[in-house]
Amino acid sequence: MVLSAADKTNVKGVFSKIGGHAEEYGAETLERMFIAYPQTKTYFPHFDLSHGSAQIKAHGKKVAAALVEAVNHVDDIAGALSKLSDLHAQKLRVDPVNFKFLGHCFLVVVAIHHPAALTPEVHASLDKFMCAVGAVLTAKYR
């Protein structure tokens, strides 16, 4: 998925609004995904999946950090997330569809917290960005 210059600007703009809330939004995204797509819980059998659990917050922080890293290296998302791609493909073996679920839930969280910022154009750009991140994370699957 190729991001245009306008897409990159839109994505960076949204993430500038997210600012210090990235970790909170990461955890909220995971909670939403676990409820909306309960099959995703199978990758976290050892987690306390209750609202506000320390484990969800910690993993949400990792998700947020990866997304921020991708935004900061939007011209080389594959390079920025290479180690994470290896982890998901070779060790964790996460079903690729789960990245689509995560992306959708992240869009919902952004829409809840920043409804005015999520214009149709920004929505499309953020969706393309999340698809690009998902594509990178599944690129090394065999």
Curated annotation (Swiss-Prot):
CDD domains tied to this protein: Hb-alpha-like (cd08927)
GO MF annotations in UniProt: haptoglobin binding; heme binding; iron ion binding; organic acid binding; oxygen binding; oxygen carrier activity; peroxidase activity
Residues annotated as binding O2: H59
GO annotation, biological process: hydrogen peroxide catabolic process
Domain Globin, first and last residues per copy: 2-142
Keywords: Heme, Iron, Metal-binding, Oxygen transport, Transport
PROSITE patterns reported in the protein's UniProt record: GLOBIN (PS01033)
The UniProt record lists the keyword Iron: yes
One Gene Ontology CC term in the entry: haptoglobin-hemoglobin complex
Tissues expressing the protein: Red blood cells.
Annotated residues for binding of heme b: H88
Pfam families documented for this protein: Globin
Subunit record text: Heterotetramer of two alpha chains and two beta chains.
Family classification: Belongs to the globin family.
Protein task: Involved in oxygen transport from the lung to the various peripheral tissues.
Protein name listed in UniProt: Hemoglobin subunit alpha-A
